[in-house]
Amino acid sequence: MDKRHDPSRRIIAPHGTRLSCKSWLTEAPMRMLMNNLHPDVAERPEDLVVYGGIGRAARDWDCYDKIIEVLQRLEDDETLLVQSGKPVGVFRTHADAPRVLIANSNLVPHWANWEHFNELDKLGLAMYGQMTAGSWIYIGTQGIVQGTYETFVSVAKQHFEGISKGKWILTGGLGGMGGAQTLAGTMAGFSVLACEVDETRIDFRLRTRYVDKKATSLDEALAMIEEANQAGKPVSVGLLANAADVFAELVKRGVTPDVVTDQTSAHDPLNGYLPQGWTMAEAAAMRKTDEAGVVKAAKASMAVQVQAMLDLQTAGAATLDYGNNIRQMAFEVGVENAFDFPGFVPAYIRPLFCEGIGPFRWVALSGDPEDIYKTDAKVKELIPDNPHLHNWLDMARERIAFQGLPARICWVGLKDRARLALAFNEMVKNGELSAPVVIGRDHLDSGSVASPNRETESMLDGSDAVSDWPLLNALLNTASGATWVSLHHGGGVGMGFSQHSGVVIVCDGTDAAAKRVGRVLWNDPATGVMRHADAGYEIAKNCAKEQGLDLPMQE
């Protein structure tokens, strides 16, 4: 019997102001853990899988139940330790210490590979936490929409003089992360053709309004794209097909998209990528009997897809890696020039990171969408001279369906995060918001990750693989008084390729919370500015000076 599988479970986080725990500082992590497994949020909630292949919220259902039980009895001077999804200890700390400290999927570097991890996973000794799955701050596909939108807007500016009308994006993957591409692309003015092998995922994205149409053949999908482009109105199409097949077929036909990328779960060749010619049922069976054969076949198909991406790049498509490590997988099986197309961070996002700008997110623990709309208005009030940000908030309200507890993603940086958070805390204090909010972020942020094939690819000083930075980030957030802090390995790009940290803090309207919020939401993005200034980026150095950061070696 698999202790991780229970189809009878249907987890819905409590709404409103009635507490199940002893305070909001423990109620918040409980609700957010539960929200990660909401049926409209998680990819496979019955298996505790939130997103990203096998990214889980808890190691098994016994561990989940025990975490909930402990959070409900935890005092405000105690801290729960969670080791790879398993609650292993409660210790006396103090009121400003985190209520939960989490470490997921971390392995000594020599053993930091999928083979060793999978053995531990089968023995029930480890859990893959991805980024926000095991750190309890996943908010559904919205969590990556704005970052993807910002990337596609940058693509239009760099390659098409800012004009996306009549142009289209080819991509793969409509899972928890990839599902953002279709909505983000159309919001940026592109049509999008997204290949997906799992029809239930396409249907889920249709239901939550992230995909406009479904196609079952390439000809049908291309006709939909052509019709939309002729009409000047972007459309997103989920095509039920294997990305490797489709990408290669387009090369064969001489059909060149304007933009090419991919967000399949290529980071996990065993569980995340379906080999060409295989059905999902065949792959599921083979994973139980021949793991090495599945990995070999998956990587061979990735090589086909990456070669097609290179060919489409040669034909004129703006081609980018979207952080799933597919280039590395193809390189390992013989595609020697797999890295000839860039990753999205060095190509489009790094200037934002240099100012500590990244995926700031907040969640209304009340469950009331009005609380989010009120915070949207507060953001506009406090940042009045940013029409791009205002446009994003307007589009988000109009086009993004909430999944689980209402939430918002909003890319802001060092100069704005703390003051927005303090304003939210004040709104809770004076009753403008009906309950506390939690504020967190993706681990994909400016100072919280080391990932040489993604966030820290091609750093100016060559420090791509130095992982001291996310460790320092986690330590500083703990010292600053975050409500929960996490330190993970392998998120986004797979085992051996990344280390990263997460942070969440509760705005409960108290003066004590205001002090913690002011520290955490300043220090956290400041570590990103510090990291990039240390690497030699002038934008970061200037930001550090403007914001008065004390960086001894920058004097």
Curated annotation (Swiss-Prot):
Catalytic activity: 4-imidazolone-5-propanoate = trans-urocanate + H2O
Role this protein plays: Catalyzes the conversion of urocanate to 4-imidazolone-5-propionate.
Signal peptide: none
Listed PROSITE patterns: UROCANASE (PS01233)
Family matches, as NCBIfam families: hutU (TIGR01228), PRK05414.1 (NF003820)
The EC number(s) this enzyme carries: 4.2.1.49
Binding site for NAD(+): 52-53, 130, 176-178, 196, 201, 242-243, 263-267, 273-274, 322, 492
Name of the protein in its database record: Urocanate hydratase
Gene transcribed to yield this protein: hutU
Cofactor: NAD(+)
One Gene Ontology CC term in the entry: cytoplasm
